[in-house]
Amino acid sequence: MYKNNHANHSNHLENHDLDNFSKTGYSNSRLDAHTVCISDPKLSFDAMTIVGNLNRDNAQALSKFMSVEPQIRLWDILQTKFKAKALQEKVYIEYDKVKADSWDRRNMRIEFNPNKLTRDEMIWLKQNIISYMEDDGFTRLDLAFDFEEDLSDYYAMSDKAVKKTIFYGRNGKPETKYFGVRDSNRFIRIYNKKQERKDNADAEVMSEHLWRVEIELKRDMVDYWNDCFSDLHILQPDWKTIQRTADRAIVFMLLSDEEEWGKLHRNSRTKYKNLIKEISPVDLTDLMKSTLKANEKQLQKQIDFWQHEFKFWK
């Protein structure tokens, strides 16, 4: 069933709400006396995937609309499937009924970065594309925390047994850290965003540093976006403060070579992870949690906007 028209939606819209979708604020929190110089990260949803079902009538109606809409580039068109990009290639759309039926999944998928869409583009996408879908919901949400801080010297670890991969830059310092695997329900990336933009010839970053902690959530994990990194720690451990010589040597070894963790017994791994947390005056994930808490309601409004009928808040 096609939902209400654009004019009716716009009557209820307060402009600042959608304008702020990609500009989630900074929290006023700080960690402690050791970290007052660290600015709060900027927080946003950086990627979204929405899936749903098109019934036969809506599939025909949407296909007809897309074939004449100048903001859409359509290809791979058959009676039961199509692919498209919309809004200057910022939105990817795919419909495949045969594949969906054979794999027992929903037949339409829409992928986009909400940070790259204007308020009017969000309304256009919601009204003209998403409104055709039934039983729609998120299958991917990416939370992005942007720090104007050099995170290359921080030590990141997880309380869980997840795969950790590190890539080093030309200067020998860590430039990208991965936790988990790409196809898992949660995949964490910590990387030098300023360097990435430079490599991709994107807009220059004016700040001295820009690092991103990005948490990619898929499938069932999207429901836990507001509590999805409690096991993660981004630390500055001071191994020299450890009194016991043997422990000090082992911690130094573990901080210097990730492969050494695999040689420890499980109980020893737990012991030294706790010790590393104790000797760090800062854990940036505390700042991430307080920032997320301060912005949770605004982020939930974004989710509600995409998932529900057009009901705008005051």
From Swiss-Prot:
Mention any Pfam family matching this sequence.
Rep_trans
Reading the lineage from the top rank, the first entry is Bacteria
What keywords are annotated for this sequence in UniProt? DNA replication, Plasmid
One GO biological process term is:
DNA replication
Q: Does the keyword Ligase apply?
A: no
UniProt keyword annotation of Lyase present: no
Q: What does this protein do?
A: This protein is probably a specific topoisomerase involved in initiating replication. This protein is specifically required and may be rate-limiting for replication of the plasmid in vivo.
What the record says about family reads: Belongs to the plasmid replication initiation factor family.
Q: What's in the misc comment field?
A: The nicking site of REP proteins is sequence, but not plasmid, specific.
Name of the featured protein: Replication initiation protein
Protein species of origin: Staphylococcus aureus
